[in-house]
Amino acid sequence: MNQTAGASNNVRCPPGKGHKELVGSNPPQRNWKGIAIALLVILVICSLIVTSVILLTPAEDTSLSQKKKVTVEDLFSEDFKIHDPEAKWISNKEFIYRERKGSVILRNVETNNSTVLIEGKKIESLRAIRYEISPDKEYVLFSYNVEPVYQHSHTGYYVLSKIPHGDPQSLDPPEVSNAKLQYAGWGPKGQQLIFIFENNIYYCAHVGKQAIRVVSTGKEGVIYNGLSDWLYEEEILKSHIAHWWSPDGTRLAYATINDSRVPLMELPTYTGSVYPTVKPYHYPKAGSENPSISLHVIGLNGPTHDLEMMPPDDPRMREYYITMVKWATSTKVAVTWLNRAQNVSILTLCDATTGVCTKKHEDESEAWLHRQNEEPVFSKDGRKFFFVRAIPQGGRGKFYHITVSSSQPNSSNDNIQSITSGDWDVTKILSYDEKRNKIYFLSTEDLPRRRHLYSANTVDDFNRQCLSCDLVENCTYVSASFSHNMDFFLLKCEGPGVPTVTVHNTTDKRRMFDLEANEEVQKAINDRQMPKIEYRKIEVEDYSLPMQILKPATFTDTAHYPLLLVVDGTPGSQSVTERFEVTWETVLVSSHGAVVVKCDGRGSGFQGTKLLQEVRRRLGFLEEKDQMEAVRTMLKEQYIDKTRVAVFGKDYGGYLSTYILPAKGENQGQTFTCGSALSPITDFKLYASAFSERYLGLHGLDNRAYEMTKLAHRVSALEDQQFLIIHATADEKIHFQHTAELITQLIKGKANYSLQIYPDESHYFHSVALKQHLSRSIIGFFVECFRVQDKLPTATAKEEEEED
């Protein structure tokens, strides 16, 4: 056996017979000087090593432990409140914005002079929620005691006040005092304004003049004039406003939406009275009667003459939606008509003096037509307009690009030409500069998860230039607006850094000044353990799918973290972006050491129409495959605890999270420990007609797609996993009926579920207190699910069963 002699326990072998000592018997003299030099050298080397370690260690690592973790309280605190100045251009050089302290300011870009139009204390004294300045800057319109109706719509009281210190004057219809209005807003000129009361439209030529009722056919809850009903607000126009001023203010286009044949839905109110009450409203479900719509134009100078714009004479348009209205000139209005199946659209230019509409462009799809409510941009004479349409770009299908349509004098034919092309999307056209022959737009040309501001020449070579690339630090996701002559632009950086707003010269991109830096939010972020964000791609069949991973700030490869998959997946949506966000997911990562992953799979937007429309008539099926591939990719990482994996989704994402929860892993074992769904869609025949029919076809013609996508077919496998369902009982978008139907199936399948309800609350949780409670509930559920104690690794459990 080999033995090793330690330095402190020397083993000495005595000399045997016949062996001679090779050294003398006198002990050697020690070299004390050499030893001292050696020790000094060692000390110098050690000090150099220590110094190097200190210098090379990142400062953030040494200070990380001193930083606070993000909490639920942070989400709703002033420290984390992003201030949006809501800047709006009103001329070639001037814009109006609201400063952080509340005052409304007029600022001149060239002189850098600022004028206070409205003191913040005046807004506070009126308890005003919204304000709007008249075009002549003489008056301000305030709204207060505002109550939400649906996602965008609201009712409230309105007052007018002369700038800067005038007394407030109530805005009311002639026949009613102290009226709660559905809408009020200025026109494009002077002090002209309209307001809507009981679905009728009233017009004031200027402040002080009595309002006149110009549209009188309204019927509360049934016939809407100038406003959207529920379906148009939520799914079609995506706005509560359904009226449009001509540029010169002489005419008003408005939609009349008739819900008289649409079935009624009743939302119960359980609290506040001995017997529950109900709120009825018209809600078209898949296959039921839809609202009818017509577009009218009224003249505002002289006698009001009401003229209806004629829809296309096309058999495919027997039932249609109006998805976009935009004035081209003071007498021409552009309208997009979309058939109920949402696979044929016709863009027309209507004469506001005759009602005759001329077809300018037609689009058709074998699946569905996406992005149908986007407005074209017109030249001043209306002969040329720019619009976004899907153009084939090779194997990845179609991408959305700018097309220009030019009409020639004395000719019925228009010239169509593409301005942009490539495997990326134009996400929005912003402005057209006729003087410089440039079009300004946002696009994903850099990366699908980014948004940058570009310009393109509209003549000759169509050369493009990125205006926002490398313009502002830590800013890759932007939006923008231009002054009236396009000499200046406001750049709103929305991420990945803390949002900022800056003002730039268009010619040389020079930054003129910072309008909002959100410095307090930046300080709060710097003081917190914010998640590390990583981006990856996974290969699924013929697609390369983007993935976003949020890791704790203190992440190390040697630890084991629970994994949460967050799904949205609404067709055309995007989860993986570089926008700045601080949400309950941030809290789960920062305070509770979870890893969160998101993946934009088939059905998501901004990666071509081929990937987008793969999910047609089979919602859930392909999304499950892609999301599970993202989970499998993460489970290959050593730092992920395979016994603590969860999934969460909201709305359509709630449908997907419930669909995915029973999914099996590669060894046919359960992948997910738990899951949660907030306001889940569970049966598409119970959901809004425009949404369900867009992706599954018209209900009643072929219902197989509706039957196949029911969650009832999936939840029978939910036995062991913890499952939390959260739903508001007065949800006007996804009715509690969805959850009730799901629970019936869960009980039959003996599933382990929990239900949390919010009595009498709407879909959008307008109350801050309820939003905070909701965040705590979701976080608390996953923290409990991820607890390590009493958890037995799956492999160990199986081995013990085999031994028994």
Swiss-Prot record:
Glycans are attached at N112, N113, N258, N343, N410, N474, N505, N752. N-glycosylated. It holds the Pfam family Peptidase_S9. The chain crosses the membrane at residues 35-55. Residues 1-11 have a biased composition (Polar residues). GO terms for cellular component: membrane; plasma membrane; synapse; voltage-gated potassium channel complex. The keyword Flavoprotein does not apply. It is found in: Cell membrane. Detected in brain cortex (at protein level). Disulfide bonds join C350-C357, C466-C469, C475-C493, C674-C785. Disruption phenotype: Knockdown animals obtained using siRNA technology have smaller brains than their wild-type littermates. Performance on the standard Morris water maze indicated spatial memory defects and learning disabilities. One of its GO terms (biological process) is neuronal action potential. Residues 1-34 are cytoplasmic. GO terms for molecular function: potassium channel regulator activity; serine-type peptidase activity. InterPro entries: AB_hydrolase_fold, Peptidase_S9_cat, Peptidase_S9B_N, Serine_Prot_S9B/DPPIV. It is a single-pass type II membrane protein. Belongs to the peptidase S9B family. Homodimer (in vitro). Interacts with KCND2. Identified in a complex with KCND2 and KCNIP2. Forms an octameric complex composed of four DPP6 subunits bound to the KCND2 tetramer. Interacts with KCND3; this interaction modulates the channel gating kinetics namely channel activation and inactivation kinetics and rate of recovery from inactivation. This is A-type potassium channel modulatory protein DPP6. It comes from Mus musculus.
